[in-house]
Amino acid sequence: MSGGLLKALRSDSYVELSQYRDQHFRGDNEEQEKLLKKSCTLYVGNLSFYTTEEQIYELFSKSGDIKKIIMGLDKMKKTACGFCFVEYYSRADAENAMRYINGTRLDDRIIRTDWDAGFKEGRQYGRGRSGGQVRDEYRQDYDAGRGGYGKLAQNQ
């Protein structure tokens, strides 16, 4: 085995952390990064509003045993709003999901996964002003899988 591969296997994670950091994280960047490197929880984005928890389970369980799935909800309507959290029992299973599921298609949408520092109650709700995700507030195009036009475009 090459030295680089051995080093990668011994590291906290050889699935790279993205540049994204949760702006609402309570703590400093160093603490958040430390949690991200140990986390077994993934954020899953760009889901259709119609994707079910069962579909998430079916896809993500191919990478390992799932401890919990938390569907993202519109904080006003309590309906799905295009994201979820998937928590695995082991870091290795979460890494497999990052490696093999990120960028795949589910419900005709390319989904993206990212490390999450760990689910906390309240994070299942969208952070946009209208209750959904912020990105859906400003979207100008029509997207049937995400509720039609963005909220601002609907109000024009």
Swiss-Prot record:
Effect of D114A: Does not affect mRNA cap-binding
Recorded GO MF terms: DNA binding; mRNA binding; RNA 7-methylguanosine cap binding; RNA binding; RNA cap binding; snRNA binding
Recorded consequence of changing D116A: Abolishes mRNA cap-binding
Effect the entry attributes to changing F83A: Abolishes mRNA cap-binding
Residues bearing the modification Phosphoserine: S13, S18
Region (Disordered): 124-156
Outcome recorded upon mutating Y43F: Does not affect mRNA cap-binding
One annotated Gene Ontology cellular component of this protein: nuclear cap binding complex
UniProt keyword list: Acetylation, Cytoplasm, Methylation, mRNA processing, mRNA splicing, mRNA transport, Nonsense-mediated mRNA decay, Nucleus, Phosphoprotein, RNA-binding, RNA-mediated gene silencing, Translation regulation, Transport
Chain positions with N-acetylserine modification: S2
Location(s), subcellular: Nucleus; Cytoplasm
GO biological process: alternative mRNA splicing, via spliceosome; cap-dependent translational initiation; histone mRNA metabolic process; miRNA-mediated post-transcriptional gene silencing; mRNA 3'-end processing; mRNA cis splicing, via spliceosome; mRNA export from nucleus; mRNA metabolic process
Subunit architecture: Component of the nuclear cap-binding complex (CBC), a heterodimer composed of NCBP1/CBP80 and NCBP2/CBP20 that interacts with m7GpppG-capped RNA. Found in a U snRNA export complex with PHAX/RNUXA, NCBP1/CBP80, NCBP2/CBP20, RAN, XPO1 and m7G-capped RNA. Interacts with PHAX/RNUXA, EIF4G1, HNRNPF, HNRNPH1 and ALYREF/THOC4/ALY. Interacts with SRRT/ARS2 and KPNA3.
Family: Belongs to the RRM NCBP2 family.
Name of the protein in question: Nuclear cap-binding protein subunit 2
Naturally occurring in which organism (per UniProt): Homo sapiens (Human)
Origin organism lineage: Eukaryota, Metazoa, Chordata, Craniata, Vertebrata
Gene coding for it: NCBP2
